[in-house]
Amino acid sequence: MTTILKHLPINQRVGIAFSGGLDTSAALLWMQKKGAIPYAYTANLGQPDEEDYDAIPRKAMEYGAEKARLIDCRKQLVAEGIAAIQCGAFHNTTAGVTYFNTTPLGRAVTGTMLVAAMKEDGVNIWGDGSTYKGNDIERFYRYGLLTNAELKIYKPWLDTDFIDELGGRHEMSEFMIQSGFDYKMSTEKAYSTDSNMLGATHEAKDLEFLNSSVKIVNPIMGVKFWDENVVVKAEEVSVRFERGYPVALNGVVFDDSVELMMEANRIGGRHGLGMSDQIENRIIEAKSRGIYEAPGMALLHIAYERLLTGIHNEDTIEQYHANGRVLGRLLYQGRWFDPQALMLRDSAQRWVASEITGEVTLELRRGNDYSILNTVSENLTYQPERLTMEKGDSVFSPDDRIGQLTMRNLDITDTRKKLFSYATTGLLSASAEVGLPQVDNNNLTARGLQDKSK
């Protein structure tokens, strides 16, 4: 049985994720006029560019909603954001600058909490504003059906009747005016923006062209750090974690995780911390480009990973990064609550995050330019006296190191034999000029090798 409805279900309750913008306003009014019974659901995700959440449900009622609800998703959103930091669930990076998966995290929370609210109201048909070319249509599809097995999906933007009548923003605006609503289109920007309290995404339109840089973006969570006319003063900041959870900023303890994230955003935003420009692979494997803001997530991530490197051993850190990349991709694909993701999340939170206790002090400057000034933790395994170059008691002696190096002879001998085996088969060629294998004309050559075993 299909779960996607191609045409509007008449005389049935249809839930719509309602933002109050032109698209969802026109869609709600159109559905009501065509005979559906629209229910409007708005997620309060702490969007930095939203001024009056309470006005949004009132708008929905004016446009014909049978019922309109505002769902506070902020606490759950911050919880999922902190979980992502604990697990390093980020797979899109460019030259060490990270995209913190803030939109996928928002979709995971919105897709589950709004559908749960609809289910309470006996609404089993859901629509949202995602287009068929993007990631969100699949994310919402997965999270919606995970939350309500009886759910049917109706999207006006997949309905040819809706598209024929209201296929563009001009047509939607005219429809609203003709219906008695003095709805003026907002000024068109050179790109589109989607945000929640974890971060903002700027994409599409002019940003689809790679010769349009971050300089055309007006940040909504930070400053134009690239503009030398913008004054950005260096600032010293401390971040404290207890058992993997951020608890204090600049010595101020926060009992409310939402308030802590908001303050982290304010601190990082003053410097433009956490902005990145990424070319990424969408779920459908086509590449897209986005410019992202995430000042609070970046600040917490830097402090968390600093403690991580001082507390855990190399193999644990390697596994954390490897699993984090896999988990980040699952999150991006809308699989944050799938068993394979839960398994990776549980292992990272149970065995890695639980040991992350301590405080990191940083100096923030412009953009992603910062220095770590101090790291303090009762769990640090970093102990400088073990490797001090000064005289004094040491945990091991020169004779101990000689013995350790002697043991390396076993694998060095095996490796040398392998290299000569490769030379015998023609994979490597030998020369007396250079003593190391190197690439030459697309072939790896071993020069100057002498088989000491013969």
Curated annotation (Swiss-Prot):
Pathway note: Amino-acid biosynthesis; L-arginine biosynthesis; L-arginine from L-ornithine and carbamoyl phosphate: step 2/3
Claim: Amino-acid biosynthesis is one of the keywords in the record: yes
Cleaved signal peptide residues: none
PROSITE patterns, A to Z: ARGININOSUCCIN_SYN_1 (PS00564), ARGININOSUCCIN_SYN_2 (PS00565)
GO BP term, example: urea cycle
Description of how the protein assembles with itself and partners: Homotetramer.
Protein name: Argininosuccinate synthase
Record organism: Yersinia enterocolitica serotype O:8 / biotype 1B (strain NCTC 13174 / 8081)
Lineage, uppermost ranks: Bacteria, Pseudomonadati, Pseudomonadota, Gammaproteobacteria, Enterobacterales
Gene: argG
